[in-house]
Amino acid sequence: MDELKNIIRDIPDFPKKGIIFKDITTLLADAASYQRMVDLLSHRYIGKKIDKVVGVEARGFIIGAALAYKLGAGIVLVRKPGKLPSETFKKSYELEYGTDTLEIHTDAIEKGERVLIADDLLATGGTMAAVVDMVSSMGAELVECCFMAELEFLNGKNKLPADKVFSLLKF
């Protein structure tokens, strides 16, 4: 895993002073590293009968679509308001300073479907907790929330079901 971790570059003071941003674009741009990351994540879920992979806007689409393809599952998009063309289910959630809202098509997941939620990075856990609530309220069975990377010091997994979180890389 160290070879994958080492490809992710640190950008100091982005998006604001005092933050060290984990830039995953370097890993995504390296074909061998991207393939290895997708293979490692997908291997965990082979045989788990995943019906849908939910990708969280925007970088979760990159990981979610690749996983859905490898697992023979459908891909479902969770987006910011006003980006989906049909009827949506909305979920607002608290941020450090204010609120945000996510949307999913109301017909994207059927009751009882086995769902894997994918995103690039687990930080504070607020966004993923909202997505878990959305998927659960639609009647889906949550298999797991999977992440390419996790910033452990932010304790984001404390906001998620304890046995339903997997992060490939930990910082």
UniProtKB/Swiss-Prot annotation:
Superkingdom as given in the UniProt entry: Bacteria
Pathway, per record: Purine metabolism; AMP biosynthesis via salvage pathway; AMP from adenine: step 1/1
Example GO molecular function: adenine binding
Keyword set, alphabetical order: Cytoplasm, Glycosyltransferase, Purine salvage, Transferase
Reaction(s) the record says it catalyses: AMP + diphosphate = 5-phospho-alpha-D-ribose 1-diphosphate + adenine
Main subcellular localisation: cytoplasm
Compartmental location: Cytoplasm
InterPro entries given in the database record: Ade_phspho_trans, PRibTrfase_dom, PRTase-like, UPRTase/APRTase
Protein family per UniProt: Belongs to the purine/pyrimidine phosphoribosyltransferase family.
Function: Catalyzes a salvage reaction resulting in the formation of AMP, that is energically less costly than de novo synthesis.
Name of protein: Adenine phosphoribosyltransferase
Naturally occurring in which organism (per UniProt): Geotalea uraniireducens (strain Rf4) (Geobacter uraniireducens)
